[in-house]
C-alpha cells in the first residue's frame, strides 16, 4: 500500500518532468490545515525561480483537484529543493558525483550512523563515499536520509554564475 505522499508523487511527477522539473520530495507539515510541501529542482541544472515554483504550483494544484487524493483542507507549498537538497532517489547520487553529502543511516555501519563525504560513485544499489582519507561503502537501503552539503567550493561556483 502506497503512502499518500507516494500517491501524490505518482500523479504529479510526469507533468513536472514535462515542464523541465524534477520532483524531489512530497511531504506533509502541520495538522489543521495540512500543508502539502513539494520540493522541485531543475532537470537542466538551472536555478529554480519564484516563477518556476508558481508555474509548478498551478499545475500541481489542478492535478490534485482532479485526483482528489487529500480528504481534508490543505495548503500547497511548492519550493526549490535548495542548495542542500535532499537525495531521495538512488539516481540522485550519480547526478551529484563529486559533491559533498551528509548521510544518516537507519542502523550502525562500522559503529556509526552518520557519514559525511564526497560521492565517488553509485552503482548496484551501493553508494561509495570518500570520508576524509578512507572510502566508505554504504548500501542504499540503509540510508534514512541524505542531503547535499553547501561547501566553499560550491559557493564559489555559485558566485561565478
UniProtKB/Swiss-Prot annotation:
Belongs to the RimP family. GO terms for biological process: ribosomal small subunit assembly; translation. It is found in: Cytoplasm. It comes from Rickettsia conorii (strain ATCC VR-613 / Malish 7). Keywords: Cytoplasm, Ribosome biogenesis. This is Ribosome maturation factor RimP. Pfam families: DUF150_C, RimP_N. Coiled coil: none annotated. GO terms for cellular component: cytosol. Its main location: cytoplasm. The gene is rimP. Required for maturation of 30S ribosomal subunits.
Amino acid at each position: 500500500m502506497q503512502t499518500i505522499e507516494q500517491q501524490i508523487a505518482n500523479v504529479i511527477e510526469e507533468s513536472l518532468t514535462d515542464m523541465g522539473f524534477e520532483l524531489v520530495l512530497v511531504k506533509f507539515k502541520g495538522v489543521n490545515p495540512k500543508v502539502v510541501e513539494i520540493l522541485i529542482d531543475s532537470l537542466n541544472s538551472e536555478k529554480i525561480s519564484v516563477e518556476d515554483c508558481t508555474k509548478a504550483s498551478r499545475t500541481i494544484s489542478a492535478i490534485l483537484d482532479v485526483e482528489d487524493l487529500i480528504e481534508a483542507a490543505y495548503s500547497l507549498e511548492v519550493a526549490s529543493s535548495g542548495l542542500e537538497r535532499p537525495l531521495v532517489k538512488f539516481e540522485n547520487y550519480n547526478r551529484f558525483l563529486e559533491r559533498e553529502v551528509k548521510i544518516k543511516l537507519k542502523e550502525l555501519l562500522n559503529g556509526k550512523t552518520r557519514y559525511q563525504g564526497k560521492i565517488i560513485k553509485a552503482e548496484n544499489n551501493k553508494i561509495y563515499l570518500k570520508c576524509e582519507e578512507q572510502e566508505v561503502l554504504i548500501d542504499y537501503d540503509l540510508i534514512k536520509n541524505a542531503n547535499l552539503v553547501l561547501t566553499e567550493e560550491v559557493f564559489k561556483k555559485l558566485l561565478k554564475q
